[in-house]
Amino acid sequence: HDAKCSAVSLGKDEKTGDNLFTKTKRKPGYTYQYEAVGKALQLGWNKDNIGSHIVRNNIIHDCGQNGIVGHLGCVFSEIYGNEIFRIATKHEFFGYEIAGIKFHAAIDTQIHHNYIHDCTLAIWLDWETQGTRVSCNLFTDNIRDLMVEVSHGPYLVDNNIFTSPYSFENASQGGAYVHNLVLGNMKRWNELNRSTPYHFPHT
């Protein structure tokens, strides 16, 4: 708790690139994302030696940027039984990594049975939400509950309870939203100007 930035990081190896868009501004951010995937594969990134973390039964609160964050390193992981609250509510940071749970490339990651409340954004899944399942979570009193951005799927959002005034934003393709209780607004749009990298299924 009370981490200035992140409580738990399931990050990626710095050798695949670290914040290159901000440092160089030579090309769009999604191009660096493509390159990070390619570099990771060249460095031996695979299911046998990356990811497969379990983050369970934690109370994570009062963090400045995010509660749990991951980029490629969060693949094949399971996040469950956590209570996450008051994340980014002091507005110390602005940007694209603000959420209770913020994952890039959450390939085959399971996020279930968490209670996420009183956050700026509860869960933000970005780039390569592929084989991901968000299931049986309770969202209350967030500014936004869920955002899925620039992903091709497939991913599943099922049996969640979304009670915040703004339930979710979907700027992706390939998602199935099934058996959720949705009490707030929803927004859906196509984001076709940024291509998404992908891995072969379950790799």
Regions found by a protein language model. Name each.
Residues A3-T203:
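Glycine- and acidic/polar-rich repeat regions and solenoidal domains
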